[in-house]
From Swiss-Prot:
Binding site for Ca(2+) 1: E26, D56, S62, Q65, T139, D195
Cofactor(s) in the UniProt record: Ca(2+)
Chain intervals for the UniProt region annotation (RNA-binding): 1-19
Primary residence: virion
Protein name: Capsid protein
Binding-site list for Ca(2+) 2: E26, D56, T139
Organism whose genome encodes this protein: Satellite tobacco necrosis virus 1
Any one Gene Ontology molecular-function term assigned to this protein's record: structural molecule activity
Alphabetical keyword list: Calcium, Capsid protein, Metal-binding, RNA-binding, Virion
Length: 196
């Protein structure tokens, strides 16, 4: 009986210490703005998390791992000469080893209406965080945007700099694809994180 009480006291003390440490963690911020991009009918993949490089600044990391507390993606599509569709897929690469995924690793075909690639979906390589379609019309709303807020997760890195080779498991990406080349799209990504 005394041993059980002692174990409970130790557990309660450990939880209290952990809570105290977590309340004093330094929250850092990273922002990435990407504007004036032409709609890509074959798709393009943008790396969102590898800009968090090693260093001592408020937008850098200490080691090879960060814990994202929350992150936000803001996307906007603008129809120029014809009505068009923009598709934005925000995803996490669970098995990344220093590369930027290709469009065909995420989608079955390079088409804005395509389903996800069944092989990588079956292997659970990617976690789709959000899949958003913006239909912009010249006779209606020619500019549309969407803001997506999500809780975070762990991101690992294989290096210190902002290159594809530094990507590790948990890296965050956005795929953009559309039905016409004449539209423009913008995105901004913000992550609030702590060193893990």
């Amino acid at each position: 009986m005394a041993k059980q009480q002692n174990n409970r006291r130790k557990s309660a003390t450990m939880r209290a210490v952990k809570r105290m440490i977590n309340t004093h963690l330094e929250h850092k911020r990273f922002a990435l703005i990407n504007s004036g991009n032409t709609n890509a009918t074959a798709g393009t993949v943008q790396n969102l998390s590898n800009g968090i490089i090693q260093g001592d600044d408020i937008n850098q990391r200490s080691g090879d791992q960060v814990r994202i507390v929350s992150h936000k993606l803001h996307v906007r599509g603008t129809a120029i000469t014809v009505s068009q569709t923009f598709r934005f897929i925000w995803f996490r690469d669970n098995m990344n080893r220093g590369t930027t995924p290709t469009v065909l690793e995420v989608l079955n075909t390079a088409n804005f209406m395509s389903q996800y690639n069944p092989i990588t979906l079956q292997q659970k390589r990617f976690t789709i965080l959000k899949d958003v379609t913006l239909n912009c019309s010249l006779t209606g709303e020619s500019i549309k945007d969407r803001i997506i807020n999500l809780p975070g997760q762990l991101v690992n890195y294989n290096g210190a700099t902002a290159v594809a080779a530094s990507n590790g498991p948990g890296a965050i990406f956005m795929l953009q694809i559309g039905d016409s080349l004449v539209g423009l799209w913008d995105s901004s990504y913000e992550a609030v994180y702590t060193d893990a």
